């Protein structure tokens, strides 16, 4: 051999290896072909070193180094951590039995044949190593083999027939039977034999594998989903949906995360949530799902479906559920107010088509939205139009009283002191003055931030409503005493200064004092008349000096 290293291999335009061409040709059919082609081009330079370019080699320099060690007889140990790289490298380099016996490809295939005897951790580790050479491993069928191995291992430790079938077993069994591969049919059959009537809510029996599988990349998980035939709209498995939610929770998007890689998994999770939402997920859980999945660029269709389910049960939400931080795409404000508006529209639309306890649900959501408005009012980026859009999303029947909404308006006015008079007037249009309690109406009238015309309008509405609907026994007494003295007001008009409405308390006190004085005079007059009548009766009967015959007047 004239040159020990007469072959230069430039690998993936990054690494260079110097090897003996005769030795490497004994094991690799791919390199043998390239060497022959290079020799034909260099007939006049027989003693010169041959240079060949190898691109898109799986495993990079580490993988090629393992191959060279095998060819040079250095001995390599095939295990679950390197078998995927060695298998893909041997297929790429065509290291078959045609060249030499017990070549590298045959050895990796024999090792993979024992996959169904591997431990659970070994299969997961091998799948993880496939991520380095995923495109090659997938095209060579290695990923499919490992996925089938994982799916066969899961039922050995849990009853997860629902992973491989619909949440309602009869819904799609016949439809999917014809499209099953032999491996999938075997896994389904194996899991069906082990299925029992145990509950699937137990984390220890059905979800023990969630954390282990969460170390895998999105491409591997998508392969698993596709193998089960549950991709996107075909997902009707509750356990699989829970796994996807758990998986995506551990992959919270950040600067180094490609959201598009997970968008398909997020859409599949949404379909599973929508399919089993009302029976498997509470309202709070649904908001958690929305928070998790919104960061992965889910499709418009998936978002609409998810918001529809949440909107239908919105009356079960709490204030914390609604306080979802605003997104970063040009959305101003602390909280995602547009989301709440969309959910309210769904709730109201569904409420108009349902009967029964819808009025109770509507009043419950009315109280919740008033609390929500009070919470978001201090936000300096919250526009008046957006505040009104939230407040006016509900009909008047959703609020027995508008006191809570007035308090939200007051907080907004205090937090936005530079608001114009026009905007302050506009802000108050969502109030139903007839549904304000007497105390709240008095507060509104004295509030210097409320435009005077609004205060007058509220007081007029309060007069009309109080005549027909007093709020309490104490208010009823006040209302009767005040409005029964209108004749007195007509006879003695009073100048009213609207500025600041500081006259309201003094006006009521004067009114009450005059009314009590008139009532006392009337009572004293009646007492004197009765006393004189009794005295005249006593004189006629000759008992003028007997005080015992006088009746009690009070």
From Swiss-Prot:
**InterPro entries recorded for this chain?**
BTB/POZ_dom, NPH3/RPT2-like, NPH3_dom, SKP1/BTB/POZ_sf
Q: Which superkingdom? A: Eukaryota
Ranges annotated as biased composition (Polar residues): 545-554
**Can you give the residue ranges of the NPH3 domain?**
207-465
One Pfam entry name: BTB
- Please name the PROSITE patterns in this protein's record: BTB, NPH3
Q: Where are the transmembrane segments?
A: none
* Annotated pathway: Protein modification; protein ubiquitination
Q: Where is the signal peptide?
A: none
Q: Name one GO biological process term.
A: protein ubiquitination
Q: Does the keyword Phosphoprotein apply?
A: no
**Domain BTB: from-to ranges:** 5-80
- Stretches for region Disordered: 522-554
**Where along the chain is composition biased (Basic and acidic residues)?**
522-534
- Could you list this entry's UniProt keywords, alphabetically sorted: Ubl conjugation pathway
UniProt record similarity statement: Belongs to the NPH3 family.
Q: What does this protein do?
A: May act as a substrate-specific adapter of an E3 ubiquitin-protein ligase complex (CUL3-RBX1-BTB) which mediates the ubiquitination and subsequent proteasomal degradation of target proteins.
User: How are the domains described in the entry?
Assistant: The BTB/POZ domain mediates the interaction with some component of ubiquitin ligase complexes.
Give the protein name, as stated in the record.
BTB/POZ domain-containing protein At3g19850
Its source organism is Arabidopsis thaliana
């Amino acid at each position: 051999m004239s040159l020990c290293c007469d072959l230069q291999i430039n690998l993936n335009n990054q690494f260079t290896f110097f090897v003996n061409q005769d030795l490497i040709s004994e094991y690799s059919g791919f390199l043998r072909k390239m060497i022959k082609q290079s020799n034909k081009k260099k007939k006049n330079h027989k003693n010169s070193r041959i240079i060949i370019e190898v691109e898109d080699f799986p495993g990079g320099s580490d993988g090629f180094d393992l191959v060279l060690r095998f060819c040079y007889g250095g001995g390599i140990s095939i295990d679950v951590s390197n078998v995927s790289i060695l298998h893909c490298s041997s297929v790429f380099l065509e290291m078959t039995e045609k060249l030499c016996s017990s070549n590298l490809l045959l050895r990796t295939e024999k090792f993979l044949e024992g996959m169904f005897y591997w431990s659970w951790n070994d299969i997961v580790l091998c799948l993880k190593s496939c991520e380095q050479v995923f495109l090659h491993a997938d095209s060579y069928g290695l990923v499919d083999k490992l996925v089938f191995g994982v799916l066969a291992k899961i039922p050995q430790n849990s009853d997860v027939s629902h992973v491989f079938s619909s949440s309602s077993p009869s819904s799609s069994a016949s439809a999917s039977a014809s499209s099953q591969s032999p491996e999938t049919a075997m896994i389904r059959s194996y899991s069906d034999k082990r299925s029992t009537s145990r509950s699937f809510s137990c984390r220890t029996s059905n979800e023990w594998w969630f954390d282990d599988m969460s170390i895998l990349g999105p491409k591997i998980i998508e392969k698993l989903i596709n193998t089960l035939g549950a991709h996107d709209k075909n997902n009707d498995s509750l356990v699989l949906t829970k796994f996807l939610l758990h998986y995506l929770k551990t992959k919270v998007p950040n600067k180094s995360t490609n959201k598009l890689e997970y968008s398909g998994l997020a859409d599949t999770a949404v379909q599973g949530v929508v399919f089993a939402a009302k029976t498997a997920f509470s309202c709070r859980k649904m908001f958690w799902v929305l928070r998790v999945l919104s960061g992965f660029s889910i499709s418009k269709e998936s978002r609409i479906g998810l918001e529809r389910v949440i909107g239908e049960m919105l009356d079960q939400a709490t204030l914390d559920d609604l306080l979802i931080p605003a997104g970063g795409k040009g959305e101003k404000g602390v909280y995602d107010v547009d989301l709440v508006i969309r959910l309210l529209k769904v709730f109201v639309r569904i409420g108009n088509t349902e009967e029964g306890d819808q009025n109770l649900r509507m009043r419950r959501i009315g109280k919740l939205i008033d609390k929500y408005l009070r919470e978001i009012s201090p936000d300096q980026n919250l526009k008046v139009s957006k505040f009104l859009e939230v407040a006016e999303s509900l009909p008047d029947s959703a609020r027995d009283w508008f006191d809570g909404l007035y308090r939200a308006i007051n907080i907004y006015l205090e937090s936005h002191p530079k608001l114009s008079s026009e905007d302050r007037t506009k802000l108050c249009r969502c109030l139903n003055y007839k549904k304000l309690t007497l105390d709240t109406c008095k507060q509104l009238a004295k509030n210097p931030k409320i435009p005077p015309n609004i205060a007058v309008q509220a007081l007029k509405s309060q007069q009309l409503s109080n005549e027909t609907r007093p709020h309490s026994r104490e208010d009823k007494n006040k209302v009767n005493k005040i409005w029964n003295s209108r004749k007195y007001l007509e006879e003695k008009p009073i100048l009213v200064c609207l500025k600041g409405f500081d006259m309201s308390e003094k006006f009521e006190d004067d009114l009450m004092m005059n009314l009590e004085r008139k009532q006392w005079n009337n009572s004293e007059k009646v007492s004197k008349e009765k006393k004189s009548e009794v005295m005249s009766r006593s004189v006629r009967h000759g008992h003028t000096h007997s005080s015992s015959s006088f009746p009690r007047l009070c």
